[in-house]
Amino acid sequence: MPSFSFLRTFRLSLFPPYPPIATATLHSQSHSQPHSHHHHHHHHDAVASFNRMLLMRPPPPTFHFDNILSSLVKNKHYLTVISLFKQFQSNGVTPNLCTLNILINCFCHLSHITFAFSVFANILKRGYHPNAITLTTLIKGLCFCGEIKRALYFHDKVVAQGFQLDQVSYGTLINGLCKAGETKAVARLLRKLEGHSVKPDVVMYTTIIHCLCKNKRVGDACDLYSEMIVKGISPNVFTYNTLIHGFCIMGNLKEAFSLLNEMKLKNINPDVYTFNILIDALGKEGKMKEASSLMNEMILKNINPDVYTFNILIDALGKEGKMKEASSLMNEMILKNINPDVYTFNILIDALGKEGKMKEAFSLLNEMKLKNINPSVCTFNILIDALGKEGKMKEAKIVLAMMMKACIKPNVVTYNSLIDGYFLVNEVKHAKYVFHSMAQRGVTPDVQCYTIMINGLCKKKMVDEAISLFEEMKHKNMFPNIVTYTSLIDGLCKNHHLERAIALCKKMKEQGIQPDVYSYTILLDALCKGGRLENAKQFFQHLLVKGYHLNVRTYNVMINGLCKAGLFGDVMDLKSKMEGKGCMPDAITFKTIICALFEKDENDKAEKFLREMIARGLLEV
């Protein structure tokens, strides 16, 4: 029999001294107590039965008490179980190993791992031999509390003492390691199992494959999949779903469908999740015909589409502006007795809002109420954002009032939309008021919020205030992103602070944020307009040498600078160069060149470019 003497010192060395088990310190964990009528009724009956059993003389066997405690745990009444255990002990009933395992489980669910190990010490003190359930529960508790290294240490010590954990134990530890992103530790643990009495199973492999796919290491996931096949471990539908999802995330639909065909050949039936993953991937690529065809295939296989299947398709149609088809699909799901949920309505309301069809969007909001579907904070945010983008701030305030009336607290997204909307309609005072009132309402502005403010202030030529907010971000340990930097660079350039803009661009790089083509185009434009054409030409050449994929806007900025200087030879060379790189001139390119040529009385050349512009379909005659 293995010795557990080390665990007594393990407990003391790993955790602080344990106070006596008490529920007083746990009452704040009210989230663990469900409040539905059904749960309340079950809870009341279970407690009453437990108390009746305690009054019996002699009391019934302990396993009867264990059954009641287990049923309460299933309904997440962890505090009740702890309280009943105290009564249990005070009435002189001796707990068995199962009782103490239940208690450990409760403390682990409440994130009180120290109390869980106190119970474990109690098990050892009573001379009970901890079983795989005891140890697995403690491993799970340590992982749940983020104590991954301690979970591994606990595992190593237990195994070193000769105690055999089971597949559930290892599955639990692997799952905890994966959730913590400890993929190297997982790989080491898997190798340790080779030659071990506990063999890796499909659950363990699938858990690791899921972790790798989540981290976009699909190649490594495929290698592990091949390894399990070689070892004679048959993949199941969950394994395939995980890999299919991984390939879809990477945009490799060909491999994803290849796995679907492999499933069919191996007589592993795809489930609704398999089809949903693939339909979602097709929808995101705009392949609606193939997505609809796949849904028909699942119906033929007697796999019923669920609300998520329909939401995927409705979302894809909405993003393509096919609102008629999206609405028809919602009607179809209702005919199939699949009730639309809040996400279905949010998808449709969002699509209508983006098309400016606010009347139809509000009609859907009313329909939600008729169907007893409560709008979420996201529903109201979608409406406020859409109204803000149309400059309808009075209506946006009405929606905000509706939101408050529904007892839904506005979040940072709500305030961001309001601030953005107020800047759009030039109501800077209102935008600033909303921003400064956020903290009083218990909402902390995020990076996007500061970016909206900085961008809005810069556009209103209030650059000093924008810089002040930028500095405030740093004092609050908030890291500006590329959009924040670019907004401020643009503001500085447009307000004739080019040197400060260049300095900020350098600082941006020092912070590990690489400026993009849009950021550089702003600086290039400022150099050209600031009469520093030679610097602009050098800078433009530097971008080409560095391999930046310049867009038509960047070329247009440089062409405009050259045209203003009358350097038409350079303009023609640059036009040829951009076409050679696959960047086609647009209407702005031609208009810039034509206007400059006419200004310099180069009428013949201007007319030649005008004919070319018409021939390319860039000007309607």
Whereabouts are the PLM-identified features?
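N-terminal mitochondrial targeting presequence
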Residues: 1-35
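Methionine-biased hydrophobic packing positions in alpha-helices, especially
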Residues: 53, 88, 123, 158, ...
